[in-house]
Each structure stands twice: as structure tokens, then as C-alpha cells.
Amino acid sequence: MIDPAYRKKMVVVEGSYAVAHSAKVCRPNVISAYPITPQTHIVEHLSQFMADGEIPNCEYVNVEAEFSAISALIGASAVGARTYSATTSQGLLLMHEALFNTSGMRLPVVMTVANRAVSAPINIWNDHQDAIAQRDTGWMQLYVEDVQEACDTLPQLYKIAEDNEIMVPGMVCMDGFILSHVYEPVVLLEQDLTDNFLPPFQPEDILDPEDPKTFGAFASPDTYEEFRYLHEQAMQKALPKIEATAKEFEEVYGRYHGGLIDGYMLDDAEIVVMAMGSILGTVKDVVDKYRAKGEKIGVLKVRSFRPFPKEQICKAVKNAHAVVVLDKNISIGTNEGALFTETKSCLYNSKVRVPVIGYTIGHGGRDIPVESIAKVIEETKKVAKSGITIESQFMDLKEELL
């Protein structure tokens, strides 16, 4: 039951509006904007907020393409501005080169990605291929389950990214259309609470003609490796910071969506279903039905894909009889989704010996009915008893199209 006092705070708004409102109350200094479906509504709402004078001390920059959008934020962040943008799919791919520059210069840019399939063939619907393709660019990636979490994760990610021990950019990844265009009840972030939770951005190093420094300098073989090492160390420092920030957010706002991971019916689970994003809601509904029959099925939500929470995942599944990983992406050439590959990797040298299988699902926005989730669970139960026969496969292929 939702507390009546809490219910009174809830409003029914579009996901994109809620995210734009969250970005607004984080008090950005520079917003760069280029429209691309299904992200467009986010920057449209921010444009309206700017026109209405609701975002003080902020510059809204209309650019001609996504490469310029991220480039504008690189310059702004380097001089000490809190920056924000939003993109998706081909726009995120166009940013690819500059994503490395952003993270390599240790600029804590924060961006919302309304996850969408990539071309070709052209597809505007949801999967995670766009962000997964950027997993090695040095950005943090936090995947959200619903609109409320998409709102609440933005100030958390700013706080993590802008920590002077970390200084790494980050993406809040929300499922395009499924979350960006849905209308559902949310509590919009309050300005006073957000001001208390998220302090102003105060970087130790900025571009300043009075105190000249170099960003993105030329690095020879004598120094380049140390840059990469320090970047990786910052990511490792982000692991406990993500956990601590989620708990601090709960203390201020009363809401908790998980830290690096989150469990549902997990403590005694014999079969564990792992996933990221909005599909978790469907999975939980199916698991509830299994639990009603007395079957010990649980859900492991992976919230942080970068940095990857190896220790937390190993601990979460150590007592399981079998694990199934659902991926809304495919790493072409491996016949595996990225979360499945990462999960196997972190278990390999651990003391946890549990069979893991994977399914790639929902490509290009294909519907994922509860019957398909139930089928996956039934197959995983067979693995727990008899072992793995097929390690990873596509789900719900239409044979008549092959």
C-alpha cells in the first residue's frame, strides 16, 4: 500500500517530462540539445523550462548534431560548468569518438540515454544496443527500471560523477518509448531537497586563463598507461560511491531503487533471473506467480553496468541452483548479450559454481510477453537439474522469417 501522504505528492506525467524536471532541479549550467526519437521530448521540455525562466544561470545550446552536443559539453565542463544532455541510438553512436575524450579528460558530464535499437535496418523502438556499444568508453552506465528511478538517478549520478575522487562522466539509461513516453504516477524531485542532497559542482581543476592547465594533452608511451590506470581506479572508487549515494538518497527522499544491484525474492531463490531496465517489472510479475505456487524464483536487478559489480553479483547468486540472464542486446560474433558475458566472466574465477544461461530478447522493441518469461524460467529449472545444453540463444524467433 502506498502511504496516503506520499500519494498526494504523486502526479501523472510523461516520462520525458519527469526526467527533464529532474535535470532542471539539478541546476545545470549548460544544456546541449539535438532532437532524436525517442529522446526529443526531454530536450523539448527543458527548452520550455528555459523559456519560462525556470533554470537560472544556465545556457541552452541548440546544436546541429549529436557530435556537437557532446563537444559543447566537453568545453563547458572543462571550465567548471555542470552539464547535461540527452540522446539515443544513432545520436549516441555519432558521439562515440568524443565520449572517449570526455571520460579521458575526466569531465563529469551527465547524460540521459533513451535506449533505442541501432541501424541498419532502421528501427526506432527500444533495446539496449546503443548504450552497450559504448560500454568501453569510460562512462558510468546506470540502467533504470521505471520513470521514478530515471528521475531519482540523475541527482545521484551527478553526485557520484562530480566527486573529486572519481570525476568520470555517466549515463542514465532508460528504455526508449517504454519509459520515455509512458505516463505514470511519479513524485517530481523537490528543489529544496535536491539542493540539500546535491551540492554545487566545485572541481579542483578547470580551464582558467589566470591559472593555466592543459586538458587532453598529448601523452607518450611513458605516461599513457598511467592515465588508463587512474581512470580505471576512479571507476573502482565509484563502486562504493554508487552504493553510498543510493542510501543517502533514500535518507533524504525516502526512495531506494538499489545501489549497484537490487534483489527481489532473492534471499532463498533457487532460480535467479538477471536483467536490466524496464523488463524487470514484467519479470517480477511472473516471479510473483511462481512464488504463489511455492517455487523459489528470484530476480537480480543489475543497476550499474559500468562499473560492473562483480563481487556483488557473485554474492547475490552464490546459493542459486541456476541463473538465467536476459539481455536486450547482442554482441555479434559471440551469440551472447553483454550482461551474460560479463556475468560468466565474474563467476569464472570465483568460488561460486552455478550454471548460467542467457537469452537475448526484445530486439528492436519486440514485445516480451509474460509467457516468454515463464518459458525461460522453465528452461532454467531444467538446467538446474540436468546441466546446460544451449548456453545462449535468441528468444521468440519467428521461424517463418528466417
Curated annotation (Swiss-Prot):
One of the Pfam families matching this protein, by short name: PFOR_II
Nucleus recorded as keyword: no
GO molecular function, one term: pyruvate synthase activity
Listed EC numbers: 1.2.7.1
Source organism, top-level taxon: Archaea
Keywords assigned: Oxidoreductase
Main enzyme class: oxidoreductase
Position of the signal peptide: none
One BP annotation, GO: response to oxidative stress
Complex and partners: Heterotetramer of one alpha, one beta, one delta and one gamma chain.
Protein's recorded name: Pyruvate synthase subunit PorA
Organism, as annotated: Methanosarcina barkeri (strain Fusaro / DSM 804)
